[in-house]
Amino acid sequence: MRIAILSFDGFNELDSFVALSLLNRVPGWHAMICAPDATVTSMNGVMISAGIRLDTLPDMDAVIVGSGVRTRQLAADAALMARLRLDPSRQLIGAQCSGALLLTTLGLLETVPVCTDATSRPWVEAAGVRVIEAPFHASANIATAGGCMAAHYLAAWMIARGAGEAQARTVIDYVAPVGEKEATVERIMSVVSPFLRA
């Protein structure tokens, strides 16, 4: 499984790096930071090299659209949005927080409930979609998560969809706090599991 973690200048480190780390713990999976340019700088000044560029998006098996401080400007950039070629008929697609605004702009969230963070909610609602007060929601191959600490829900859903629920539990168990492993796995999977059976 090849996965793009779509990150733009001003990206939120939690959204991009938590997903990157969790997804790469699945044997045979390769999650990479995807950006428009060779380097991308986070909202807190962390500069990293992009593993892949936007032109590779159609070749990915899955894509996570992260959030950041410039999302509204990105959504208004028609030329950039035209470069984001996603196909929910064959790709697993997830959006974290304000990343939902980009999926909305692409017309991918028109008929499904959407999760996003409190700051992004007015922008996403203004774009014409229904935002719900929940950390995670998925419909078919598209999922959204709201709140930086909801990144693990998005990753767990993607792992469960692509490699099975047992693998998702294994990955979450590995990174869960000591003394809280069982409770953490059960909490995360209780949120994600209903959307695996829908």
What are these language model-derived features?
Residues A38-T39, A118, S139:
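Positions that flank functional sites
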